[in-house]
Amino acid sequence: MREEMIEKKYEEMGISKEVYRFGKKIEDELKERFAAIDATAEYNQMKVIDAMQKNRVSAECFAMSNGYGYNDLGRDTLEKVYASCFHGEDALVRPQITCGTHALALALMSNLRPGDELLSPVGKPYDTLEEVIGIRPSKGSLAEYGITYRQVDLLSDGSFDYENIKKAINEKTYLVTIQRSKGYQTRPTLSVERIGELISFIKSIKPDVICMVDNCYGEFVEEREPLDVGADMIVGSLIKNPGGGLAPIGGYIVGKKECVENAAYRLTSPGLGKEVGASLNVISSFYQGLFQAPVVTAGALKGAIFAANIYERLGFAVVPNGTESRHDIIQAVTLNSPEGLIAFCKGIQAAAPVDSYVTPEPWAMPGYDSDVIMAAGAFVQGSSIELSADGPLREPYAVYFQGGLTWYHAKLGILMSLQKLYEQKLVNEDMMC
């Protein structure tokens, strides 16, 4: 009776019986996998609670501050919690950091000086970082300040090109940036273990080089984080995993004290650093979001695995595949046509609690070199821990799906995306057998 009620409710929301029953079959096959995700979430939940208890979080920490923000107890305690949770010496966690790209730019520009060289040993960075670095000319880029950039691509099988990485490291190499997630690429996301192996290799050649990890989309997916395996600095956004869907803005930098201090002086000004920067009225959402982040991340991870198994079964190329271990919440699905990419995103939008009536269309989004389509009926604009999908309108027409504040919402989004493809005859009933 209960299962019939659930199926009927999905049907009322536009999911056909064929699509729902196909999804139910896939879901039933994933029970053991989902149990393992829940175990990781439980460990990470204890890790967050432990960090909060050790740093004596109190109700006073949730008070609003304004003006200069001197002696902001909530802000200062939260940064201690982040440092404890991610195993860093210090942390900078601020609403004044507007997004992940801003956090990364802040970390790079504060720790590099003219004449230094930045090395990416994992290939091309995320599109928005190309202008930060100066790969694509932009005002205020690293290149404008005389900071050079060198890149070593991954090998065709996704492994590190150790030979050319060794050749690329020279006396000017000051900072190495390692992007954990795939971005708009179909390369594998890096596990914490693989990141550790790469850092060990790099530091065996040049021990004093700073190794920074772009940790976006990866927090709480595994039991360990990059600082546990030798990274000097990790950087991310609070409207992704660690904000738990509640943080309305913000970014973080955690790691070696000197690296974090440099970032703080760049964010505010020399002589002020971490001492200023009011937390306004968002500080309680930062705490509460971090508290529930492990469980929210687990729901998003289940959604990604569900999507991989559904679309792989239908014959589409997916990265990671349905059985691979997971190291971030992003799922790439290659839909092979602009029609497929647009239909998928329309399905995600139609499943949203906010702006479900809106039809997403491709547009020239700032920071990207091709039109991008985005679906995100979110409570927080741009939040990618909430159910969202996006992709550039260029071959191979891959969509990047992520998020879902609950597993059930992620499930609805995937089924709705499939429904849209089904209605446009881009998949058929025979494929869902």
Feature map (PLM): residue ranges:
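Conserved PLP-enzyme active-site core in the AAT-like
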Residues: 2-27, 31, 38, 48-54, ...
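Flexible linker/loop signature enriched in Pro/Ser/Thr and Pro/Gly
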Residues: 85-88
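Conserved C-terminal alpha-helix-loop-beta "cap" of PLP-dependent enzymes
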Residues: 312-432
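N-terminal small-domain helix-loop-helix segment of the aminotransferase-like
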Residues: 66-74
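Short glycine-rich or small-residue beta-strand-to-loop segments that form or flank ligand, phosphate
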Residues: 61, 65-66, 92-95, 329-334
